[in-house]
Structures are given as C-alpha cells and as structure tokens.
Curated annotation (Swiss-Prot):
It comes from Arabidopsis thaliana (Mouse-ear cress). The lineage of its organism: Eukaryota, Viridiplantae, Streptophyta, Embryophyta, Tracheophyta. PROSITE patterns: HTH_MYB (PS51294). GO terms for molecular function: DNA-binding transcription factor activity; transcription cis-regulatory region binding. Keywords: DNA-binding, Nucleus, Repeat, Transcription, Transcription regulation. Residues 155-171 have a biased composition (Low complexity). Can form complexes with MYC2, MYC3 or MYC4. GO terms for biological process: regulation of glucosinolate biosynthetic process; response to insect; response to water deprivation; response to wounding. This is Transcription factor MYB76.
Length: 338
C-alpha cells in the first residue's frame, strides 16, 4: 500500500507565504507539535501542500534557527563536506548546528561557489582549473646578441686595463706561462737528479774506500798486538826476550811508529784519479739516472793486501781531494725530492 501524497485536491496555493499563513502554522504547531505534515494544512486551515508547510516551518518559522552571516569555520566545513559528499545539503546541515539545509544550499550557490572559481578551483571536483591562469607569464628570453654588444662596448671602454685583452690571448698567455714553468721544473729536476747521481756515486765510492782502509788498519793493528802478546805466556822464550817484550808492551804508543811492516807504499792518488775517470765513463754509459756501485768496477783496480801502505796519508788525501764530498743535508733533501 503506497503512501498518500502530500498535495491532493485542487485549488492549492503556491508561491510566497503571507503573514497570516505563517501565524496559522505557528499557532497549530505550538498547540499540536510537529509531525503529520500531510494533515496539518487541513487542520490548520491552510490551502497549502503538506511539504510546503514542513519546509516553511523548518527553514523559516522554527524559533531556534540561526540567522545571519556564516562564520569562517562554517564555510570551511561546508567546503570540505561538499568535496566529499557533493550536493547532499541535508547531510551537510547536520554538521552545522541551527543551520538549515536550504540555507546551506543558498549560501553555497551565492557565495562559496563563486569564491572557489575566482581562486582557480573547480567547485565540482575541488581541483585546480586547467585555465586557472589566463595570463601565464612567458619565460624570459635572453638576448645573446644584445649581451655580446654590451660586453664589447664595456671591453672597448676599459681597453687600458688587462681585462680588455681578448679571452683567447689571455688563455694563450696563461698556457705559455704554465708550459714554460713546467719546462723549467722538468729541466731543473733532470739537472738536479743528474748532478746528485754523479756526486752521490763518487762520494759513496770514496767513503767506501776510506772505510775499507780504516777497517783493514784496525784488523792489522789488532793482529799485530795479539801476535806480540801471545809469546808472553810461553815459558820457552829466553828471559832477555821476555823483558824486552814487556818493555815494548809498556811503551806500545811508540810501537806503531817503530815497527816497520815492510809493506810497499801504494800510490793511492793515482788509484783515486783512475777511479774517478772510470766513474765518469761508466756514468756516460749507464745514463745520469742510474747509480754506480762498487761492483761495477773491475776487481783489478784495488788490491786489498797492498792498499794499506800508509793509512794516515790516505785519509789526508781523501779529505783534501776536491772531488771528495760528504753527504750533506742538501743531498738528503734532493733524495726526498726525487
């Protein structure tokens, strides 16, 4: 069984409500309360539809209805609920106390909808409009020709300064300076390395010869002293020889100068000159960057048995020789540099 429609019969009034109609409706609802909207028009003596009476009471005549401007918070609630629920005004009005759905709908259509369009937002989808920026800012174009002309004018006005030189000439000058500096550094490095290789090899050879001569002298003096001391313990020697030997031991400071070892004197200066000449020849053969070792020389140059002729004269000659060089701090710095 279907419901009875709100409006039946003929001669129903439509349009704006009058003051008399409003008073009749208010008086009946105060006496009988809300509800039964299909029967209210007949009972209240109104020639109106039941739906029209309900809407008139709910939206206008109800005493607790909130009138006036919508606050900022109410506007934000309407916008957010409309984005999620759409045009369901009764649902939106439930979240706004004392606000009717009709009032919310009217306020949306007259205020909020136009405001969103002005802000570039679609009132239906609540997304930015495609043509939200009718006058887009064109990208700034850079005029390279104008910029080059300005640079040329500024370079001509400051022709007396070094900055007015062409860029290519500045680059060429910088490259030439860098290349010349690299050439000087490389040449200095090679010459320093060559000089260090020559001087260090000669000094090592001379120092090795001096150290060898000194060690042989120490060994020989020790062996002579041991030979002279060994007969002192034997009992088969005559007393006269032992007494003379004890006297020699007591005066051993004169022993080194009084004993003739019968070792032929070796011509060390001639040996050293020959050694230096051979060093120069070997350096020219192997190149400036290779060091010469004692093993590179023939073993026939030095006789270890005859090299101990006069140790004192050898040391003096080594110290006085112009090509004899000690390994100084400068040589060690050059090693670190290499």
């Amino acid at each position: 069984m279907s419901k009875r429609p709100y409006c039946i019969g003929e001669g129903l009034k439509k349009g704006a409500w009058t003051t008399e109609e409003d008073k009749k409706l208010i008086s009946y609802i105060h006496d009988h309360g809300e509800g039964g909207w299909r029967d209210i028009p007949e009972k209240a003596g109104l020639k109106r539809c039941g739906k029209s009476c309900r809407l008139r009471w709910t939206n206008y005549l109800k005493p607790d209805i909130k009138r006036g401007e919508f606050s900022y918070e109410e506007e934000q609630i309407i916008i957010m609920l409309h984005a999620s629920r759409g045009n369901k005004w009764s649902v939106i009005a439930r979240h706004l106390p004392k606000r009717t759905d009709n009032e919310v709908k009217n306020y949306w259509n007259t205020h909020l909808k136009k405001r969103l369009i002005d802000d570039g937002i679609d009132p239906v989808t609540h997304k930015p409009l495609a043509s939200s920026n009718p006058n887009p800012v064109e990208p700034m174009k850079f005029d390279f020709q104008k910029k080059s002309n300005q640079d040329e004018h500024s370079s001509q006005s400051s022709s007396t300064t070094p900055a007015s030189l062409p860029l290519s000439s500045n680059l060429n000058s910088v490259k030439s300076k860098i290349s010349s500096g690299e050439t000087q550094i490389e040449s200095g490095h090679v010459s320093c390395k060559k000089r260090f290789g020559r001087s260090s090899s000669t000094s090592r050879l001379l120092n090795k010869v001096a150290a060898r001569a000194s060690s042989i002298g120490n060994i020989l003096s020790t062996s002579i002293e041991g030979t002279l001391r060994s007969p002192a313990s034997s009992s088969g020697l005559p007393d006269s020889f032992s007494q003379s030997y004890e006297y020699m031991i007591d005066n051993k400071e004169d022993l080194g100068t009084s004993i003739d070892l019968n070792i032929p004197e070796y011509d060390f200066p001639q040996f050293l000159e020959q050694l230096i000449n051979d060093d120069d020849e070997n350096e020219n053969i192997v190149g400036p960057e290779q060091d010469l070792l004692m093993s590179d020389f023939p073993s026939t140059f030095v006789d270890e048995d005859d090299i101990l002729g006069d140790i004192t004269s050898w040391s003096t000659y080594l110290l006085d020789h112009p090509n004899f060089m000690y390994e100084s701090d400068q040589d060690s710095d050059e090693k670190n540099f290499l």
